[in-house]
Regions:
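Short, well-structured active-site flanking segments
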Residues: 78-93, 299-304
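Active-site SXXK
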Residues: 50, 64-82, 140, 230
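Active-site-adjacent, His/Asp/Glu-enriched structural segments that form or flank metal-binding
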Residues: 89-158
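Beta-lactamase-like hydrolase cores
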Residues: 2-61, 124-131
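Extracytoplasmic
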Residues: 38-40, 48, 57-59, 65-68, ...
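Extracytoplasmic/secreted cell-surface and envelope-processing proteins
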Residues: 53-54, 117-121, 149-152, 252, ...
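A mature extracytoplasmic/lumenal domain signature
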Residues: 47-49, 58-60, 72, 90-96, ...
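A small/polar active-site loop signature that marks catalytic segments
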Residues: 135-136, 146, 156-310
Length: 314
């Protein structure tokens, strides 16, 4: 047999592009003009005063992948502000016996905080304990828009919430999340007992009845911290949920177009995370970055506050 591979007459994968440069580079720096950029690659580098350092096919549209999250971050901060917090309401239709620590009735949870996670369920249990409540004779009920632990299935989220509320049902993952939360928030030593609330009823997805009374509201971290976490981990789930708060990818596109002046034919999104077929030109992305930087300054923030910084963030 021949030692030289022979190409198949009908290859499974066929090249559709070329690694050869298809255009010359526009640059204010002579040595950069000699750089051969392969294929159809869009590049635009500008100095802070707006001078072009390097440019190549910057008006063509490309799939920006996770750079879409920059647009989503801009849109949610522009709409809600950096200090916005998602509320999660805790309600009841029952009565409380302080001598036994028993709540006779149901507990209802409302809210659609996309960052609501395992440790936040334990935090609600801790707050119920602070009110003296340690057992509930009724059901645990969540509304149909309740989100927990990156699950949009409300029934699954409700079951996860019940497991995080009751110390007897918690697994090692929930306990680890709670301990990490105490450590990172500087609250180690402030919670003397293990938070726990037991339920004798079931777990359901229903609306909150009109006779229910609010016990308290749990608030998320500020929007700027949620955006920072989303960007550091390039979290597709968080990015999609934040985009949903605005009306989806189309709404994110419109907010960017209206506030930056980029034309619709150079900036259109199918998703809020970067998954799927999105199309953005380097020129449009540069306009977004400039406007975003300016708006962050008005919020007394910089890109460091909402994007990962190498060697500093983990």
């Amino acid at each position: 047999p021949s030692a030289t591979p022979i190409p198949a007459t009908t290859p499974t994968v066929k090249p559709i592009g070329s690694s050869s440069a298809v255009s010359t580079v526009n640059s204010s720096i002579p040595v950069l003009r000699e750089v051969a950029i392969p294929g159809y690659s869009g590049i635009l580098v500008e100095s802070l005063d707006g001078k072009i350092v390097m440019e190549n096919l910057s008006s063509l549209n490309y799939n920006p992948a996770s750079n879409v999250k920059i647009a989503t971050s801009y849109a949610v901060l522009k709409t809600f502000g950096p200090e916005f917090r998602f509320p999660t309401g805790v309600w009841t239709d029952g009565s409380f016996d302080p001598t036994s620590g028993t709540l006779y009735g149901n507990v209802y949870i409302s809210g659609k905080d996309p960052s609501f996670n395992l440790e936040h369920g334990v935090s609600i249990s801790n707050e119920l304990n602070r009110l003296g409540i340690r057992s509930v004779t009724g059901d645990l009920v969540v509304t149909d828009n309740f989100i927990m632990n990156y699950s949009t299935n409300p029934q699954r989220a409700a079951a996860t919430l019940q497991a995080s509320l009751d110390a007897g049902k918690r697994n090692a993952t929930i306990n680890k999340s709670w301990q990490s939360y105490l450590l990172n928030s500087g609250k180690v030593g402030q919670v003397s007992n293990v938070p726990s609330v037991s339920f004798t009823g079931g777990v359901y997805v229903q609306q909150i009845p009109s006779n229910a009374k609010m016990l308290f509201t749990h608030e998320s971290a500020p929007m700027k911290e949620i955006v920072k976490a989303m960007m550091c981990y390039s979290n597709n789930y968080l990015s999609e949920r934040l985009g949903d708060m605005l009306g989806g990818a189309f709404a994110v596109s419109r907010i960017v177009q209206q506030n930056t002046g980029v034309p619709a034919n150079e900036f259109y999104l199918a998703t809020s995370s970067g998954l799927g077929m999105n199309r953005v030109s380097p020129r449009a992305m540069m306009k977004l970055l400039k406007v975003f930087r300016n708006d962050l300054g008005k919020m007394k923030m910089t890109f460091n506050d909402i994007m990962p910084v190498a060697g500093m963030d983990k």
